[in-house]
Regions:
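Short, Lys/Arg-rich flexible segments
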Residues: 1-195
Length: 195
């Protein structure tokens, strides 16, 4: 997927964070070693599922798929699907990584809010112990929380609603919520090499 960088300019922490970023990096998302390679019920892995949801995709409808969709629609009591359209199933982008982590710099604001109350104590602790890992972990936890909040709030109200067919099939109108397995694969990791 892509790389998102956040520039933090926060008083006394500025120099501390610049030093930390030279030796630590934080990743958040559907990560290798954290379930990304596991297979979903549909036969794709969670990294692929995450990419489909993050960026959207168009899937060409085959004859076999058209028959399945027609039978499923009938079983669900939906009107017969018409042979109109462009011959594709369109899955809209429902960004659970880029949008939450870049919109109004939510991660930075969340980290700042967590640090506000104890800024001097945190700086003293990290300076005394040279423990940049603590700050990197705090950033990772905050980023993961923001991403998970996107799942809870339908992308902060920005995700496209499910189609009537999808609602009938899933039994729910909430996007990305049928099994919860994708959001359960969201993880963060801190790497000490700065990459």
């Amino acid at each position: 997927m892509g790389e998102i960088k956040a520039k933090i300019n926060y008083g006394k922490l500025k120099e501390l964070i610049q030093n930390m970023s030279k030796s630590y990096s934080v990743k958040v998302g559907v990560l290798a070693g954290h379930g990304a390679e596991e297979t979903t019920e549909s036969g794709i892995n969670y990294a692929e599922l995450g990419a489909i949801q993050e960026f959207g995709c168009d899937i060409k409808i085959t004859q076999k798929m058209a028959a399945y969709l027609a039978i499923t629609a009938k079983e669900l009591g939906l009107p017969k699907l018409q042979a109109k359209g462009d011959g594709y199933v369109h899955i809209p982008s429902r960004s659970f990584l880029r949008m939450p982590l870049t919109t109004k710099n939510r991660v930075v604001k969340e980290l700042k809010k967590q640090l506000d109350a104890d800024e001097d104590a945190i700086i003293a602790y990290i300076a005394k112990n040279a423990d940049f890992m603590t700050l990197a972990v705090m950033l990772g936890v905050s980023a993961k929380e923001v991403v998970l909040r996107a799942f809870e709030t339908d992308g902060f109200g920005q995700w496209k609603a499910n189609s009537p067919y999808t609602i009938a099939r899933k039994g729910s109108a909430k996007p990305l919520q049928d099994t919860g397995s994708l959001w359960q694969k969201i993880a963060y990791e801190v790497n000490q090499d700065g990459k």
